Amino acid sequence: MISLPGPLVTNLLRFLFLGLSALAPPSRAQLQLHLPANRLQAVEGGEVVLPAWYTLHGEVSSSQPWEVPFVMWFFKQKEKEDQVLSYINGVTTSKPGVSLVYSMPSRNLSLRLEGLQEKDSGPYSCSVNVQDKQGKSRGHSIKTLELNVLVPPAPPSCRLQGVPHVGANVTLSCQSPRSKPAVQYQWDRQLPSFQTFFAPALDVIRGSLSLTNLSSSMAGVYVCKAHNEVGTAQCNVTLEVSTGPGAAVVAGAVVGTLVGLGLLAGLVLLYHRRGKALEEPANDIKEDAIAPRTLPWPKSSDTISKNGTLSSVTSARALRPPHGPPRPGALTPTPSLSSQALPSPRLPTTDGAHPQPISPIPGGVSSSGLSRMGAVPVMVPAQSQAGSLV
């Protein structure tokens, strides 16, 4: 066959058909075009024949030698009409996969379409104009039929949603990516024993099968069948029911344990830091005043009383004036024993003589010796010239 040259020729041929139809007188318009069906269905990938033929009123059914037919087939898709075949002056032109069933000239104008696709669905129009040898038109007619190309289901995909362990709920899903018309689904269990499922567990439109409260007896091979008017496709999934805890339960327990340990470690660390923060202010030493100097004093192994010494020191501090320099003439304190009588300090003389030194400690023990023996120094209050203690 000769391929169609383009839309320009299509328009010219259509104009020619209209012109020939206008030339035919009404009384001579005896041609009748026959299409037995208004709608046809075919399967994608196959072929279909669009039946069409014409008759002349008062003539035999077979074509006559004087008949000169002009035939054109059009396909309209998305508001655009396209010519798929034409037979004019003994020459046939067509698109790939399109042909006439019978050789021309013939009154049978049936059109064959091969290698069908879904996009070939739509209205097809057949137009015929018959002339005699003198070029006079014997009639013209045009009719249309609808072609619907069906698509069998594409192989579906089966999936298992959920964790199949005893007592759990799972869903088996099945989905076919392409079909025309829409498919319906059916789930069956093949092994170890055959079982067919129905609603409400089965959704025939969405292809889902809900299995609740799983048990070991529900394990097996499940087959999903996707079917429509022109075909069937299937897939399967194997369901194995676990009797132990599910993987999700184990994972949740592990994650919960790790989170608990992390929180416990955080609390311990926080408590430890708070304890250190409370200890640091307590250990700080604040120096408000300078401590008094401690004078060395002799020690005694048998005659020194520590309690009396501490009392003497306390009394001396209480009698000391809080402020001001020491008064003139005050005696310098010397270490002494609390168990012995203190000698009365002498008043300074007016003749300029130096005051007599304090008599040494009885017993012949020096102050250094007393210090080595563990004696505690005692502050002796000074006496003023008036005789009062300072």
Curated annotation (Swiss-Prot):
One of its GO terms (cellular component) is adherens junction. Highly expressed in endothelial cells. Gene3D superfamilies: Immunoglobulins. Residues 30-143 form the Ig-like V-type domain. One of its GO terms (molecular function) is cell-cell adhesion mediator activity. The chain crosses the membrane at residues 249-269. Residues 270-390 are cytoplasmic. Glycans are attached at N108, N169, N213, N236. Keywords: Cell adhesion, Cell junction, Cell membrane, Disease variant, Disulfide bond, Glycoprotein, Immunoglobulin domain, Intellectual disability, Membrane, Phosphoprotein, Repeat, Signal, Tight junction, Transmembrane, Transmembrane helix. GO terms for biological process: bicellular tight junction assembly; cell-cell adhesion; homophilic cell adhesion via plasma membrane adhesion molecules; maintenance of blood-brain barrier; protein localization; regulation of actin cytoskeleton organization; regulation of actin filament polymerization. Residues 1-29 form the signal peptide. Disulfide bonds join C174-C224. It holds the Pfam family V-set. Residues 333-342 have a biased composition (Polar residues). The modification Phosphothreonine is found at T332, T334. The modification Phosphoserine is found at S301, S336, S339, S344, S371. InterPro entries: ESAM, Ig-like_dom, Ig-like_dom_sf, Ig-like_fold, Ig_sub, Ig_sub2, Ig_V-set. Residues 316-368 are annotated as: Disordered. It is found in: Cell junction, Adherens junction; Cell junction, Tight junction; Cell membrane. PANTHER family: ENDOTHELIAL CELL-SELECTIVE ADHESION MOLECULE. It is linked to Neurodevelopmental disorder with intracranial hemorrhage, seizures, and spasticity: An autosomal recessive disease characterized by prenatal or neonatal onset of intracranial hemorrhage, ventriculomegaly and cerebral calcifications. Affected individuals have profound global developmental delay, intellectual disability, epilepsy, absent or severely delayed speech, and varying degrees of spasticity. Death in utero or in early childhood may occur. Interacts with MAGI1. Can mediate aggregation most likely through a homophilic molecular interaction. This is Endothelial cell-selective adhesion molecule. It comes from Homo sapiens.
